[in-house]
């Protein structure tokens, strides 16, 4: 949920309270209707920054592990699996946008090398379709065929996400070459802490916006709190709004400092990224390599036979 910190003097209290209430209602509806990874799609042309950082980390502040597994070597025009694992404790519950507790969702963004793309349905085997399940993969941009997003989906069911990938064929694609390619992935579990506009969700710590003494803590009927801080220097009052799902750590009469945490950290999720490398191998090189190995094996066999023949001749001479 989006929140605002309001500063006001006593004659303005009624107007400021009404404005704050309307703002919370409007922004709450917005946060519920929006979902990751749409935030990244709407705000960034490319999900991977020049530094290598995936932009999802701008909203998901906690660092958690993510792993991707791909074959070491693949052939041209071949369908292979890219398996993304997003591990977490299935017993964990997160704070939802309405303030209630619920299970964690997961999401991922897969950045393939240029020329690699999602395999068409008619190229996916029944076994691979079973691994994919009912997942829906969406292009990051309509004109981009090598970057895909998935989610949010229930983490209980999709801790492991399987992407069906089609490798390019350098014979028909001039931009593809027989090289080693990196594949990047970013994955998150749980909701983010920051919205793209910079405002906080209700899944993070809220800090005091002023020093002073807690004059009053008001519990709102629809959830959340209003913490009124009286500034000791000029007797102004500052209202800090806590969205639904968060409980204050302070009590009335407490002295607090600027940026002191007013709540605990409710976040149990996090974001991580990983990279894997895959070699697009030329089939002719494989054939040459197989021929080379076969030649070595045949040479070894001939040497063994020649040795046995020589030993047999020597044994015959000895017997004579």
UniProtKB/Swiss-Prot annotation:
Its main location: plastid. It is a single-pass membrane protein. Residues 1-35 form the signal peptide. The chain crosses the membrane at residues 286-306. Belongs to the cytochrome f family. The 4 large subunits of the cytochrome b6-f complex are cytochrome b6, subunit IV (17 kDa polypeptide, petD), cytochrome f and the Rieske protein, while the 4 small subunits are PetG, PetL, PetM and PetN. The complex functions as a dimer. This is Cytochrome f. It comes from Cuscuta obtusiflora (Peruvian dodder).
